[in-house]
Design a protein with these regions (language model features):
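Helix-loop-beta element that forms the nucleotide-linked donor phosphate-binding surface
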Residues: 47-51, 154-166
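N-terminal subdomain of nucleotide-sugar transferases
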Residues: 1-37, 81
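Short His-centered aromatic/hydrophobic patch
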Residues: 88-94
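Short beta-strand scaffold positions
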Residues: 35, 87-88, 148-149
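Nucleotide-sugar donor phosphate/pyrophosphate-binding loop at the beta->alpha transition
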Residues: 16, 65-72, 110, 120-138
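Active-site proximal beta-strand in glycosyltransferases
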Residues: 2-4, 102-118, 136, 147, ...
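Glycine-rich phosphate-binding loop signature in dinucleotide/nucleotide-binding domains
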Residues: 77-84
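Membrane-proximal helix-turn-helix segments that form the acceptor-binding/catalytic region
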Residues: 22-27, 72, 130-147
Length: 166
């Protein structure tokens, strides 16, 4: 099985996903990463625990034209590699990846998104609900599985989101 992990920056994968990659390797998976290379500014971090790394110019700002470049590059990578599973992380990494993976889902690729904490939650500013909730709800339609970190996010996703929630 071939798995792609995406995030806005490579340091996110280094800091949070090494245990996941180890489990995937134990199950015989080949793991690739697509994210912006920011490791030069992160002393001691290296993506030496995956088979392939793609430098994709994601930007944290939704207004950045780099996200369009990231979308185009990622779409080509996904078409070339034909992944079985694409697991995306971080808000913009998740949005751009899910858009780029739409066609591959039609051919059986599963797309997972880990929400490391919704920006809309009980007590959050109304602005957060107005902006972020509709985006997550819409993008859940092109997501096979949403993985939540907190119990509050899990309960909210179970009620409001269109895909399978864990």
């Amino acid at each position: 099985m071939k798995v792609l992990l995406t995030a806005t920056v490579q340091s996110h994968i280094c800091q949070f996903h090494k245990p996941l990659v180890e489990v995937l390797h134990k199950h015989g998976c080949e793991v690739h990463v697509a994210a912006k290379n920011n490791l030069a500014e992160k002393n001691g971090l290296a993506l030496d625990f995956v088979e392939k790394v793609y430098n994709v110019p994601f930007a944290r700002s939704p207004k950045s034209p780099d996200n369009l470049k990231a979308y185009r590059k990622l779409k080509k990578i996904i078409e070339k590699e034909q992944y079985d599973v694409i697991h995306c992380n971080t808000p913009m990494g998740g949005i751009v990846t899910r858009l780029a993976a739409r066609k591959s889902r039609k051919h059986g690729t599963k797309v997972y998104y880990t929400a490391h904490g919704f920006h809309f939650y009980k007590g959050a500013p109304k602005k957060n609900w107005i902006v972020f909730y509709p985006i997550e709800r819409l993008f859940s339609r092109i997501t096979d599985k949403l993985i939540t970190i907190t119990a509050e996010d899990y309960r909210l996703a179970q009620q409001k989101i269109h895909c399978q929630v864990e």
